[in-house]
């Protein structure tokens, strides 16, 4: 199934500018997984395995990449689900968290990919501002660019990942060629967390 991530373009190699502003020789866009039912199921099962080690009352998806995964996980695990907007909306209820109420509850924050940790830190702040506690953050992929360390340092919350980029890269190695493998490995080696 790992090779399917490359086949459908969920993992791409080349020259990319990330939303964080960083330049990268690879790009991960797990939204394309949503159009592949078998692969989507496989990804959800990996999330479930990681979440099974966490005690939580509610699942909170990070907009936008974490929302579809959090939705399915909430349904499958029979947990209330909500999501965090980038910022509180300026109309209606003015809430930043939609869906499940987090007040007095332990939340598992779910996102797809972690780079710098900025989006996840925003979600943690929103959960806490709404009276909730964060039991942990679960991502499918930690790019290995110090985001998990930033979340731990700044918020005191541990990030659990299905894959770290180095692990994913190792599994993809036979499918992407040695030159591409080395290029990404060299890029990742600059991040000392």
UniProtKB/Swiss-Prot annotation:
EC number: 2.4.2.10
Species per Swiss-Prot/TrEMBL record: Pyrobaculum aerophilum (strain ATCC 51768 / DSM 7523 / JCM 9630 / CIP 104966 / NBRC 100827 / IM2)
Gene Ontology biological-process entries: 'de novo' UMP biosynthetic process; pyrimidine nucleobase biosynthetic process; UMP biosynthetic process
Source superkingdom: Archaea
Binding site for orotate: 115, 143
Residues reported in the UniProt entry to bind 5-phospho-alpha-D-ribose 1-diphosphate: 85, 89, 111-119
Record-given protein name: Orotate phosphoribosyltransferase
Cofactor: Mg(2+)
Gene Ontology molecular-function annotations: magnesium ion binding; orotate phosphoribosyltransferase activity
Disulfide bond entries: none
NCBIfam families reported for this sequence: pyrE
